[in-house]
Amino acid sequence: MNQIDKKDIKQEVFDLYDDYAHNRLNRRSFMQKLSAYAVGGLTVPALMSFLMPDYEGNIQVKADDPRLKSAYINYSSAKGGGTIKGLLSQPKDAKGKLGGIIVVHENRGLNPYIEDVGRRAALAGFISLAPDALSPLGGYPGNDEAGRELQSKRDKGQMEEDFIAAFEYLKNHKDCNGKVGVVGFCFGGGIANMMAVRVPDLAAAVPFYGSQPALTDVPKIKAPLMLHYASLDTRITAGWPAYEAALKENGKKYQGFVYENVNHGFHNDTTPRYDKTAADLAWKRTVDFFGEQLK
């Protein structure tokens, strides 16, 4: 990121970026609307640069971290995209079998941020699998804009099957204890909710700012849930009260948190929407929750 100070950027700019990042605005319209905020020495290119992810400078756990075994694998998704690539990570010095975590990316494929989250989960003592739903189209293309375009071309139902197949792969992995949870971000948060509905033996689900399932599907949920929302993310968080009411009505085990004054994507430390305080707290809660549920 450059020298623009986050506190000097109006919330409307982050809202515009959210629309762009979720394909509700094309690039041309986004830049046109962004120009209204290019004042006081700010330029549209500078704002664009500020809002885009910075992967090189914000990786917490490097790909070659000596504490980990981390490598790409392929697994079969017969009902989905066929052969799916994913990053499998686990602690190098693990003694015994580990709880498993499926790490589900946003709406742009398996980018460096999500790979990093997979490695963070492994450092926390789990075996993690971060699949790439773009595998049938050649995989994550190296930038998020192209990744979003590719992901929009995939059939949603087939992508859901790809992540359910990832669950089966990890559950049966020789180094997994058979207890597998899922954590997902944005699109991945919606996938985590979907898996809670559709996978009866899922051990735990942690959606970060994910779209909620149909309320009529809530009775099907078996897994304990931990849900993280952002107060400024009005689009997604608006669905939380009704979802929570349905969880309560159906006697489901859940913990829900709404983090004040933070945006959708607050856990993603490669963009200016990142909020370290909220991200650190949400991640600690997540790791502790998985530690309890995946024993």
Where on the chain are the PLM-derived regions?
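N-terminal secretory signal peptides
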Residues: 1-29
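N-terminal export signals
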Residues: 18, 27-52
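N-terminal cap/lid segment of alpha/beta-hydrolase-fold proteins
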Residues: 55-94
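Short beta-strand element of the alpha/beta-hydrolase
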Residues: 97-106
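Cap/lid segment of the alpha/beta-hydrolase catalytic domain
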Residues: 134-157, 265-270
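Alpha/beta-hydrolase active-site loop
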Residues: 149-173
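Primarily recognizes the serine-hydrolase "nucleophile elbow" in alpha/beta-hydrolase
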Residues: 165-222
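Short beta-strand/loop motif that positions the catalytic acidic residue
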Residues: 227-229
